[in-house]
A protein has these predicted regions:
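Outer-membrane beta-barrel pore domains and translocons
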Residues: 1-5, 30, 41-45, 83-87, ...
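Face-selective signature of the C-terminal outer-membrane beta-barrel domain
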Residues: 1-103, 168, 205, 210-212
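Outer-membrane beta-barrel translocator domains and adjoining extracellular loop/strand segments
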Residues: 1-15, 48-56, 90-96, 123-129, ...
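Outer-membrane beta-barrel signature, preferentially recognizing the C-terminal barrel domain
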Residues: 16-19, 103, 107-109, 113-177, ...
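Transmembrane beta-barrel architecture of outer-membrane proteins
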Residues: 18-26, 43, 60-66, 93-95, ...
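Gram-negative outer-membrane beta-barrel transporters
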Residues: 33, 71-78, 166-167, 171-176, ...
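Outer-membrane beta-barrel "beta-signal"
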Residues: 157-159, 313-326
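Predominantly the C-terminal beta-signal and adjacent terminal strand-loop region
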Residues: 299-318
Length: 326
């Protein structure tokens, strides 16, 4: 008989039920040629991890205070922001970011930013049910001893409008302590990691069609071993076409992920996973001024692929949705 606890899985399987509540209050004040914003937000996470016989529940509250400011001085734009977050488990942590932009030629701008970050592990990563378990492997187990990520990052870029092409190129450098990842079938902390990358984005319109292209080169490495981090492709491409035929909106998206490395836990070795290409298509139609219907086909050509070694991803998927505004 069907059991809502086990779903379509075996009776011994454990499943997670995650609930989140979020409240935010903010205010914005115009100052000179810019603005100052501030506020408070609160988030509560609840996790129930249960089988047909046992159930464990966990809860965590996080309260944050934030302040941001932006000011335009001639051709220079300055921004700064800061946050203080109190995590019920990990206590108080402060983060900040600053950025500057300079329009050195009409239509062309240089930007530079630096900031810090903090990311607590999710309740699912700490206490949740084992994920992706199957007859082929034990899955990925939670780890209650996970530490939060702490990071420093800088980014420099140039953007401009050259003829019909709106483009941006940027370089970034992230230094992360206690990066949350998984290996040997369990969530872990990578003590120290560095992620460096170069990204180019471009947007251009040709007749009724808009083109959006993103090219990325990423070098993600474990600082202790010098190895490339698992499941992270160095080369990534995303190309999207969007357009409209009368009232019908349409889009076609292509995504390419280059080769990645992963951990073959059963045989104690690293494996190289080849690159993959995926296509998605979507349509959107306003039936009335209030009702819009959307359809999407993901993995259009029903490609067999894996983003994680040993775990087959979904084949072709069909989605139909609608939204109604009052």
């Amino acid at each position: 008989n069907y059991s809502s606890d086990a779903g379509r899985y075996a009776a011994g399987t454990t499943l997670d039920d995650m609930e989140q509540r979020y409240i935010q209050w903010g205010n914005n004040i115009e100052v000179g040629h810019g603005a100052i914003s501030g506020g408070v937000d609160w988030k509560q996470e609840k996790l129930t991890s249960s089988s047909t016989t046992l159930s464990d529940a966990y809860k965590r509250d996080t309260t944050g205070l934030y302040l941001t400011g932006q000011q335009q001085i001639d051709s220079v734009t300055l921004e700064a922001s800061g946050r203080e977050d109190h995590d019920e488990q990990f206590g108080w942590h402060g983060t900040w970011q600053t950025a500057a932009g300079w329009e050195f030629i009409d239509g062309y701008r240089a930007t530079l930013s630096y900031g810090t970050g903090f990311l607590a592990p999710s309740l699912g990563q700490q206490y949740g049910a084992t994920r992706f378990a199957s007859s082929y492997g034990p899955g990925i187990a939670s780890n209650p001893n996970l530490k939060p990520e702490e990071s420093k990052q800088w980014e420099a870029g140039i953007d401009g409008l050259t003829g019909p092409l709106d483009w941006r190129i940027s370089a970034y450098h992230y230094e992360i302590q206690n990066l949350i990842d998984y290996k040997n079938n369990q969530y872990i902390n990578v003590k120290s990691a560095t992620i460096k990358g170069l990204e180019w984005t471009g947007n251009v319109t040709t007749g009724p069609v808009e083109h959006h292209l993103t090219l990325q080169y990423v070098d993600p490495r474990d600082d202790d071993t010098g190895k490339v981090l698992y499941r992270r492709a160095k080369q990534q491409v995303k190309y999207e076409l969007t357009g409209q035929i009368y009232d019908l909106d349409w889009n076609v998206m292509y995504q390419y992920l280059g080769k990645r490395y992963d951990d073959d836990y059963d045989n104690g070795r690293d494996v190289k996973m080849g690159g993959l290409s995926l296509w998605d298509v979507g349509l959107s139609y306003p039936v009335t001024s209030h009702l819009t219907v959307r359809g999407k086909i993901a993995n259009l050509f029903d490609k067999d692929y894996e983003t994680v070694y040993g775990y087959q991803s979904a084949g072709r998927e069909y989605t139909l949705s609608g939204s109604y505004t009052f």
